């Protein structure tokens, strides 16, 4: 007899405390993945995964090794549809009725400088989350987009110049259909005073300086303009949108948030 089959399976025994656990699983598992770009190509990256399931009151433990096995078996680009399939597979493997998968990873866009045309990579922080509860599967895409903001008040009251700073626009969107990460990035960048690039030449610096000056926005303007774009996108059913300006003339940030669920009209 194989000794493995003769070993007791303690986690499968009955627990007498009768206390369900809402979420139990593994966290901070680093594992490679591929994602599909807006052009239909694939990009390889490394994800930090959190996977968990609901544990019934009478079950002592979950099958921890099966979470990692799920990552080992997974293949192909991680689209919204693939994420839903992965969630269903996890619940089947873990014999669970509810569960959650979250993966965070750096995503790179090869950007072209506005004047010189020089190419360079810019990184973005992306988190995909899938949640199954009460028979309902929900998928979320979250991306942090660094941009430039320039203060309208500073421009208005100054004889020349205006204070400007780097800002973060964070979009956390619940998806009804697959949305490429770059689509969310472009929405944030197009509504900012100016976008960022990894590498710029002097003609490019002149362009971005003047672009921001001609397009001043308060943090309130920034979050509202991005929200209007998200409202018009039928692939997005709900969102939490944040903007934070790291003020260059203060030792604090300016911050704004808009949260909306289109299904409730609010």
Curated annotation (Swiss-Prot):
GO terms for molecular function: GTP cyclohydrolase I activity. Keywords: Hydrolase. It catalyses: GTP + H2O = 7,8-dihydroneopterin 3'-triphosphate + formate + H(+). The record marks 151 as: May be catalytically important. Its EC number is 3.5.4.16. The keyword Electron transport does not apply. One of its GO terms (biological process) is tetrahydrofolate biosynthetic process. The keyword Hydrolase applies. Disulfide bonds: none annotated. Converts GTP to 7,8-dihydroneopterin triphosphate. Belongs to the GTP cyclohydrolase IV family. NCBIfam families: PRK13674.1-1. This is GTP cyclohydrolase FolE2. It comes from Burkholderia mallei (strain ATCC 23344). The gene is folE2.
